[in-house]
Amino acid sequence: MSGTQNNDMKRQFLLERLLDAVKQCQIRFGGRKEIASDSDSRVTCLCAQFEAVLQHGLKRSRGLALTAAAIKQAAGFASKTETEPVFWFYVKEVLSKHELQRFHALRHIASDVGRGRAWLRCALNENSLERYLHMLLADRGRLSTFYEDWAFVMDEERSSMLPTMAAGLNSILFAINIDNKDLNGQSKFAPTVSDLLKESTQNVTSLLKESTQGVSSLFREITASSAVSILSRAEQETDPLPVVSKHVSADAKCKRERKKKKKVTNIISFDDEEDEQSSGDVFKKIPGAGESSEENSDRSSINIMSAFESPFGPNSNGSQGSNSWKIDSLSLNGEFGYQKLDVKSIDDEDADENEDDVCGSMPGRKRPGHSESPEKPLDAGTCLSQMHGWAPLQVLHGHAEVLFPVSGVGSYGPADAPLGSLENGTGPEDHILPEPGPRYSVEASPPGQESPLSSLLPSASVPESMTVSDLRQAIVAMMNRKDELEEENRSLRNLLDGEMEHSAALRQEVDTLKRKVAEQEERHVTKVQALARENEVLKVQLKKYVGAVQMLKREGQTAEVVPNLWNIDGEVTVPEQKPGEVAEELTSSYERKLIEVAEMHGELIEFNERLHRALVAKEALVSQMRQELIDLRGPVPGDLSQTSEDQSLSDFEISNRALINVWIPSVFLRGKAANAFHVYQVYIRIKDDEWNVYRRYAEFRTLHHKLQNKYPQVRAFNFPPKKAIGNKDAKFVEERRKQLQTYLRSVMNKVIQAVPEFTASPQKETLTQLMPFFVDITPPGDALTKNSRPKVASRFPKLARGHPRETRNVEPQSGDL
């Protein structure tokens, strides 16, 4: 796949990730119902995606700028992140002076990376990201100055979507902390030696494993990379090169393929006299060399060039293919020089234990002589995990940094010593092939002796212990690996949160659909049952129709056959039968009869519906008129619920009942302020006799207690209770008047049912004998004034005694309704 296609796929991948992050934030925080803070993984993912888009394709600094940055980093004055280009360099071009001062004044932000991240989060908080993106993308000439042609922001089609996505985030209320030291990325200052030693002693095993994994991933990168040769001499091409063959077992190959490439820390190592004394002579000068190792060390700070070749394939003798590295030395002033190299070895205890199980013990090698070929490969049992013990070599190559483990060729060492670790001193574990010529060999460490943990720490008594430089490199590699794992963990967690939300939405949608389906099924079942009942009714009706048609058929045949049997002379004649005509006539007659019956049935159904509607309307009218009659004339004698079910008996009972009406039309307030009380006017009419009585509430209560003793059914009547406070309120008095009127009407109906003598001859005297409550005697002290009578008479003109009375007909008049 070409580089253009790779860049296009990368841009599309960044766009999809950014769209997904924006969508997740809109789903979670849309509508400003909840504040979006940086504690939420969705907001963190959104910021990370915007940073990746703006960081993509930034031009890197070249030449002396890169060299100066690398020297600052190696000296511990700057972190690696400051040598990388950041989008803050371009963003600050469009910011005003006050905005720049604002971001430079942040207390906890001390790097350009942190200022860029703080600007992005501030733009999200203030809903100004859309405006900034329009400003950033407006000037294409300025963009080309800071970004490569294949950068995301240089793609007009995709970059035009950035302001649109930023506008979609305006509905979210962000509250992100911009003055946070975590935005700086890595620490600005290099860690001290005491801090490094303290951290290393806490978890040495984990530290060594992480660092060795980083080195092994570096070897895979170097193996996969193409060969590079810079300033190589023609004489060096003819020199024999040492080839190290590494045989990887099937399990180790699978493990290598599964591992993801890791980012390797790039640090330039500058040697001094103390390092020379502690590490010893690693590379020996061959006879004829005109320069010392110290002179070469001084020159190595000026230019250090290496040529790597990665040949693959089987050997000429048919053995298994091996990955080999060939390193040509640099010739200075016509003479071969030697670099001053830092080569350390770290043995991983866990890796050694696993190698004992997988690879087994490794046999020793014979000591090669001058007649043996220097390209003799290692034994085939060497596993990939054995290379985890190699320490990285820092080499500055152009504007890229590479780590590479080597050991000097030409050093001494016994052949029978195990390939344990590559040491800088004169220890017996160094396995070096002496061979004249400026070249280096790369060898792997077998699972040999396990070094104790104490040997990994700096100690004056143990010359093979780790130095501060080794520990610093291992810890930095471990920290980089830790950052990578944390970033990967955050991205996976963001994806997991998104999938969980998606699955929850799907589950909710499924539940909703299930409820809808259940409701539809219930409606369908009800409809099917109704249709089944209707079908049964139609079947019964069809049977009736068929029976009626058959009956008509039999009657028609009898009527047609009998007259034709006799002619005029009285002789019996047999008519000629035509089967075809008879069948047609029968069929047509059946059809006519069936149509007539169907029409009759339809008319009956329509007539029935019309009668039902008319009956309902009449019932409503009767109920309304009855209520109006009760309001105008008082209660109708008797209760319909107490009448007989037989309609004839019910009519007889109603016609023979006594017509007694009771009202409480008004209430009067008597007495003075302290002793005021209400008097209720009770109007009674029995046929043509009418009179009024005036009673207080206490008298109604006494009547109720007496009737309870005489008629137990009276207990079920609704009698208004006594009220001590607020009993003179107008609304309360009106409500009590209605309740007392209903109560008296119920009592009169009960008396009519219980006393047949009164029902036979309803008169005033009989009623007053049964119930002295209705005696027309004004209580002492409650005599009404003359002014009160005319008022009552004016409200009820027909109820006044002095009013001339007309003769009432027995039949009810229209005015009575």
UniProtKB/Swiss-Prot annotation:
In this protein, which residues make up the domain named RUN? 37-181
The UniProt keyword set, sorted, is:
Coiled coil, Phosphoprotein
Coiled coil region boundaries: 466-546
Annotated membrane-spanning segments are: none
Q: Which residues carry this modification: Phosphoserine?
A: S269, S292, S293, S331, S345, S451, S641, S644, S648
- Sequence ranges of Acidic residues compositional bias: 347-358
Phosphothreonine is found on T643
Q: What's the domain of life for this entry?
A: Eukaryota
Family, according to the entry, reads as follows:
Belongs to the sorting nexin family.
PANTHER family reported for this sequence: SORTING NEXIN-29 (PTHR47194:SF4), SORTING NEXIN-29-RELATED (PTHR47194)
Designated name of the protein = Sorting nexin-29
Record organism: Bos taurus
